Amino acid sequence: MINKKIKKILQHRGYTTDDDINKFLYPKMEYLQDPYLLKGMEEAISTICNAIKENNKILIYGDYDVDGVTSTSLLFSFLQKIGATNITYSVANRFNEGYGIGKKAIEKAIDDGVKLIITVDCGTKDIDSIAIARRAGVEVIVTDHHEPDNNNLPNANIILNPKLDKESKFTELAGCGVVFKLIQGICTKMYIDFNEDILLLACIGTVCDIVPLVNENRIITSCGLKLLEESSNCTILGLKTLIEILKLKKTTITDILFLIGPCINAAGRLDDASYAIDLLLTNEKEKAIELATHIKNLNEERKMMCKNTVEEAYAMIEENKYTNVLYNPSWHQGILGIVASRCVEYNNRPSIILTEKDGFITGSARSNNNIDLYSALCECKELLLRFGGHTMAAGISLEKKNLEEFKLKFEEVIKQMNGDNKKQNEIKEDLEISLDDIDDGLIEGLKLMQPFGIGNENPIFKSKLAVSEIQEYEHNYKVIAYNSTKRFPAIIKKKITTNNNVREGEEYLCYYKIILGQNNCYLSLIDIN
């Protein structure tokens, strides 16, 4: 029996029928959509199968982030398993040619006799590089999820990008999700079963790319997390070794976001993403331990760099703005995206963090849940040398002389998107309840709603309650939230208590989320009136 309050929340979110609600709460692999609904799928599979049959050399080319690393590893290992022996991979290098397919990588592929290039998590905007490959007689299949310019697409043989078809059922997919559908299509054609490692890597890439956790993404992440809960279920030696080195007993979405993902990302941020790919592909335990230890150490180094840069960025944030656009030529290029995310968390503004490279300004952008970042950057494209990404994240580069004008333009665009007021800071509850309503049924319903993320946010509740036993805890306060009959441990941000002069024993109207632990829960108070 589904908890009535959970059912009401889901109905407000568009799950109007019992069948919709049941499929949402109990996702299964059998609910996956037909992969051949993705335009270009049949042609892509035919081209790949023919290349394998003819023993033509295949290159998989991926991006350097978690999505690109998992996509590359996923497709490489799968194609090997179905008979591809003449296959290699290459990964973008953040510090040489940056995001996308570098011209040098294409020229090397041509020299190496590559006949088919398959891009993963990139390629939609790599017009010049793909043109070089095509002129040399190399076939190119682009698999990507980044926003395309429909009037200026690369001359690839096939482009598998769900965003080319706005009516597509797959527009929320990450790059690894597109690869997942490609593999699903090949499995269907060849009458073979999915292997568990396909789901594991697709889950990690999807979670870390911060895409909406609905529809296909919900199935991929929910089913993948069930497999990852016990490390003994992990069929990928390198991933299992990393989980062991991180001392994770029951892997959760939080572990993926804040431990596994950052380690995989650290390879591309500070060194070379191929270390992470090699880890996910190796069948040798000693090599797995060596690589997992290396990327874990890189992540520790990354954390120290981030701490200092975030503090510097916070100090530069201006009041009464709609955006954070911050520039420091000494900031490390590999951590800009993380710093941008921290700035969004700090004040809920779309944030762009910039540094200098080779005489140009380059950086990473992150959005809050209310702004389509890619659309905003399209409004500023005349000031940019290059940009690419999607609704929530993007990369940009521009000339120094255009920086101040870009700041002003981006600020104005975001202001207009917000309807000339700061609506992004308004908090809207999913449901008003009493603390008495927080019972086993509600908790079990919230567990079924997991994993939470964009498109499936942890519900915000509104209740009248008082607080007591206020104790300082890092950047927050630990408190007890209570009414006349129930008490719950809670966390409240210092900024909220300062702004509202919160006093023990007084009743307030509070907005909060219920944070689920392994054996208990607590409230995270996000606003008090």
Where are the language model's segments positioned?
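Hydrophobic helix-and-loop "lid/oligomerization" segment in the mid-to-C-terminal part
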Residues: 2-116, 136-137, 155, 187-405, ...
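Mid-to-C-terminal polyanion-binding domains and interfaces
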Residues: 54-56, 287-291, 297-327, 379-529
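Active-site glycine-centered loops adjacent to acidic/histidine catalytic or metal-binding residues
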Residues: 63-65, 144, 512
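Acidic, metal-coordinating catalytic cores used for nucleic-acid/nucleotide bond scission
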Residues: 95-96, 122-125, 518
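Metal-dependent catalytic neighborhoods of phosphoester/phosphodiester hydrolases
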Residues: 100-102, 128-134, 511
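Active-site cavity-forming subdomains of large catalytic enzyme subunits
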Residues: 107-172, 180-188, 197, 214
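Amphipathic alpha-helical transducer elements in NTP-driven molecular machines
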Residues: 127, 173-176, 180, 218-222, ...
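Histidine-centered active-site/metal-ligand motif
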Residues: 145-146, 332, 390, 476
